[in-house]
Amino acid sequence: MEETNQFKAIDSRFVYISISSIEAIKEFVSTVTNFACDATLCSGRYIVDAKSIMGVFSLDATKPIKMVLEVGRNGVDDRDALCDAIDKFIVD
């Protein structure tokens, strides 16, 4: 009987973003929801879905926020396109 590996290696990428106003948060979430990849925001001990406006509003926006990007469940890898679309929010 041959064993199969049920777990796939996760290819994660991350960038830091700055979204310091209500309008910026609305624009950011609206843009991110148009992409298939999974996007998570990490700030301190909090982790939220970047496609959730309520989740994003709950984070401390006074500091850069780490955004982790992974290929979506459908297998579409549009992470580079997402980074291009949110370029104005990305900080070094």
What are these regions (language model features)?
Residues A9-S18:
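Short glycine-/aliphatic-rich beta-strand segments at the starts of folded cytosolic domains
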Residues I22-I25, A50:
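Structural motif corresponding to alpha-helix initiation and N-cap regions
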Residues P64-D92:
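C-terminal structural segments of small proteins and small subunits
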Residues S18-S20, T33, T40:
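N-terminal intrinsically disordered, cationic/polar leader segments
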Residues E27-F35, A85, F89:
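Generic non-transmembrane alpha-helical segments
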Residues E2-N5, C37, I47, V76-L82:
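Structural preference for solvent-exposed beta-strand-turn elements
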Residues T40-E70:
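Amphipathic, hydrophobic secondary-structure cores in small proteins
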Residues I19, S43, R73:
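Conserved residues at beta->alpha junctions
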